[in-house]
Amino acid sequence: GIVTALVLGISHVAQAQSAAAKPQLDQTSRLNILFILTDDLGWRDLSCYGSSFYETPNIDRLASQGMRFTDAYAAATVCSPTRAAVLTGKTPARLHLTDFLNGLEFPHAALSPPDWTRWYLPHEEVTLAEMLKQVGYETFYFGKWHLGGEEHFPVTQGFDHSLAVTQAGWPGTYFYPWPIVRNLTGKKGDYLTDR
């Protein structure tokens, strides 16, 4: 499920790094990679890992048909640095991105991170998407970005396509009309995650 894509992604990162001078992979030999990263989800929140409170049949089905990643930890306790670490393979401290974007603003300004903190993922950082493109993958990003404004959106970080992304990361509302950069067509009452 969630972790399956991470394991596949890591193996393809290694292939992409060693394939700089090699020809692109044959279309039939490439694996499809689906990487799902969720905010605020504990490993025991999925039924495939033992939850009796939450029912997660679709994720359970993905987990049963793929690999389960059971020995890892999150790079940070909040979204932006974790997402940046997954995309680049670097720790949040090396990226100077150790808090969620616009984190700890008023009334918590006294707790704000140091001045060296970046509030975006720099373009010079090579992302997993850029490495996968080097070996012929088409890349797509859907959902919360939260790694910088429009000049740092997924399409500037190696993703061919991006949908439902805003500067703050979430669509603002899940009911139509969606105030997102690449708006979808819809009608009153449509719910974004039902699409």
Feature locations, PLM:
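Formylglycine-dependent sulfatase
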Residues: 2-9, 14-195
